[in-house]
Each structure stands twice: as C-alpha cells, then as structure tokens.
C-alpha cells in the first residue's frame, strides 16, 4: 500500500486524498451528475479518479473497517460498514427518503431507460399525505433543510431554486437511493410511521 502511494505523482496523491475525504463525507460517488448550467448529465471526474485507484482504496478502507463497493450498472461507488458514516436523518428526511425510493422503484419498473428518475416536490408531499406520515405539514424551512441534506448525500439533485420551492419544483432521484434502502425495508419503515401515534418528529434516525 505504501509502495503504491510512493509511485504516484504529487497531483495524484492530492486527488486520492480528496476522494477519501469525499467518500467519508458523503458516502456515495456518482458516475454521472446533473449539470444545471448545461441542463444535462455529465461525467463526474471524482468517479473516474476513484475507479483508477479502486483496488488501493478498497484495501485502504478495509483496514479502517469499511468496504468500498462499486455498482457498475448504476454507476455508483459507495462505502458500507459499521465505521462508515451512517445517514443521520430527521423524521422528515427519513420519510422523504422512503417516498423517493418508492417513486424510484415504480418508475424503474416501467422499463425506464435511465438510472436517474425525475419527480416533483408536489408528488412527494402527495405521497406523504396519502400515507398519513406526518400530523402537520412541514414548514418551508424544514423542507429546504431536508432536501439540502439529501443532496449532500448524493441522493437527489434539486433542479429549481431552493428559495422558490413550489409543488412543481423538480427533483432528480439518483440511483444511490437503491444502495441506501431495499424494498422490504421501505415497507417496514412506512408501516412503522403509519402506526406511530406520537413521538418527537425531529428525532434523528440512522439509515
């Protein structure tokens, strides 16, 4: 492992350090991300760098008690393991995550040609109401904070301005959501929220 690092140029060492920090901070790396300026999906430079050093990085994280996995069909590289950063989410963030996963699975089952799925804030809120998952409508501040958190973890991309959120506000659901939640777990959590009669809605949950 030390020999591998010594053979890298200073620029490559700097890139490798950056990739390690990024993975520790956000868990996921996406092969393609949406570029709002160009209104299209573009290749992620960090993903390419990670692929180039994948074997070394897998050994590096294994020593630290984590596993670095690559899901080639969906273009996602991600960390798993007890020592990997868990997604600490508020109740609203957890609910949004569950509903995003439901929407993602439904659209993918309709023979979608893309691993990235589009939805709207309005659809999210409609689903939340139909499942009766919250007693009160979340404030705009809570919604903005929640969407920003999910964006940080590379779960979604927010296509419209955060300060102008409306029902028509568009979101992209990235394939990384399938690495966070599996079908049975989604239904289990949804049922627990439906049955919940009281409790602190801002209590963090680890996913």
Please give the residue ranges for each predicted region.
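Eukaryotic partner-binding/assembly regions in large regulatory complexes
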Residues: 1-82
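Short acidic, glycine/proline-enriched loop segments that cap or flank alpha-helices
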Residues: 108-116, 134-138, 159
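A short, conserved structural fragment
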Residues: 62-70, 147, 151-163
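Short, amphipathic alpha-helical interaction segments positioned at domain boundaries
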Residues: 170-207
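Short alpha-helical segments that sit at the start of domains
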Residues: 10-15, 81-117
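Accessory beta->alpha helical hairpin/"wing" motif in late/C-terminal subdomains of nucleic-acid enzymes
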Residues: 76-81, 157-184
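Short amphipathic alpha-helical interaction segments
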Residues: 49-57, 135-152
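Short acidic, hydrophobic short linear motifs in intrinsically disordered regions
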Residues: 34-44, 111-129
